[in-house]
Regions:
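Membrane-proximal helix-turn-helix segments that form the acceptor-binding/catalytic region
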Residues: 110-129
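Carbohydrate-associated surface elements
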Residues: 135, 157
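Conserved donor-binding/catalytic core segment of Leloir-type glycosyltransferases
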Residues: 166-184, 190-195, 204
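Glycosyltransferase donor-sugar binding loop
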Residues: 202-220, 236
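Short alpha-helical donor nucleotide-sugar binding micro-motif in glycosyltransferases
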Residues: 237-238, 245-250
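Aromatic "clamp/platform" in nucleotide-sugar-dependent glycosyltransferases that forms part
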Residues: 258
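Short hydrophobic beta-strand element within catalytic cores of glycosyltransferases
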Residues: 275-278
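Conserved acidic donor-binding segment of nucleotide-sugar-dependent glycosyltransferases
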Residues: 290, 294-301, 310-316
Length: 348
């Protein structure tokens, strides 16, 4: 018997950010390896702040779906409580939560409260909730009223790659991956690197610069003000299939995020044998082990600068962490898709 499900996503599934990569890879594995027939539903752009017309179209598209399991990405699900309430009796709704919407950095108190209330109302209507980390699952139970009995954790998968030893001298190549938005902490990273002008380093930032024009403009202006334009490159959005060479050429991955629901970029760096500097925010401590990286408090410029100085100056310490990274075995996408499929099967 052919197993069927719908997977509703906000906008273009090809967007190269972590949540969309997760959706895309799970859909691909369900379809190709596990023989599910997946109907991908585009809910439109602009989430979590869709225009009225987009919201109406999204609700209509969801209502028109057959009554098999319907997975709705949390970026949209959390702001469609009216659709969730209408469809809860007729459809097996599955909310896929990458991280609670209210925890995005840079929100006003009013916006955060509105998103929290909306997402809480929507999640009450889900037949089941899938969180992408145990950290997110705990938040959903504690703050959003999600009962543990209707909650599963399915972390992202990670592609397994060959990661050769590193002990390179000369200019240290730093890599940061993630959209240029307040939550990623690029302002903290640039401030820390500004203190290390005497050391040999170059930074490449790979991430969409269009999601927050204000943040991107501010970051470029600060880089110029500090005289770092010849040492920091912003590549913009990079397709997933083009990321591996960036990881392979990097000596050190650094991303001082203020929150991560999982932290796929950290896992990708570790899978490529790249030592990591991250923060203690959200799920990052569960993704980055002490053998593979070092963590500092979010927004702590002094601590970040100290760890950067220590690792930029010491190839041996970088290689020790790189060896730890090479020993880490994350689950594959096929393994995680099988877990995802078991959740859907349990709703039959």
């Amino acid at each position: 018997m052919v197993r069927k499900a719908a997977f509703a996503v906000p906008g273009d599934l090809a967007i190269p950010t972590g949540g969309y990569v997760y959706d895309r890879r799970i859909i691909a594995e369900l379809s190709a390896a596990l023989a599910w027939r997946i109907e991908v539903v585009d809910l439109g752009d602009g989430f979590p702040y869709p225009a009225a017309g987009t919201r109406a179209t999204a609700c209509a598209r969801l209502a028109a779906l057959p009554r098999h399991p319907v997975v709705i990405d949390g970026l949209a699900f959390g702001v469609l409580p009216e659709a969730a309430a209408t469809l809860r009796a007729s459809h097996r709704l599955v909310a896929l939560v990458h991280h609670p919407l209210a925890l995005e950095s840079g929100l006003s108190a009013a916006d955060a409260a509105s998103l929290r209330a909306s997402e809480r109302s929507a999640l009450v209507c889900a037949r089941h909730v899938i969180a992408t980390s145990a950290t997110v699952a705990r938040l959903l139970v504690a703050d959003y009223g999600v009962a543990s009995g209707r909650l599963s954790v399915v972390e992202p998968g990670t592609d397994r790659v060959s990661a050769p030893p590193r002990n390179r001298e000369g200019v240290v190549k730093l890599l940061a991956v993630g959209s240029v938005i307040p939550r990623k902490g690029y302002d903290v990273l640039v401030a820390a690197l500004a203190r290390l002008g005497h050391l040999p380093w170059r930074l490449v930032i790979a991430g969409d610069c269009g999601r927050s024009q204000q943040t991107s403009r501010g970051l470029r202006a600060e880089i110029a003000r500090l005289g770092l334009t010849d040492r920091i490159s912003l590549l913009g959005a990079v397709a997933s299939e083009q990321m591996s060479p960036l990881y392979t050429s990097a000596d050190l991955f650094v991303l001082p995020s203020r929150f991560e629901g999982y932290g796929m970029a950290y896992a990708e760096a570790i899978a490529h044998g790249v030592p990591v500097i991250g923060t203690t925010a959200g799920a990052i401590p569960q993704t980055v082990s002490a053998d593979a990286g070092v963590l500092v408090a979010p927004d702590d410029v002094e601590a970040l600068a100290a760890e950067l100085q220590r690792l930029i100056a010491s190839p041996d310490q970088r290689e020790r962490l790189a060896a730890g990274a090479r020993a880490v075995k994350f689950p594959s996408w096929s393994e995680q898709a099988a877990r995802f499929a078991r959740v859907l099967e349990s709703l039959a």
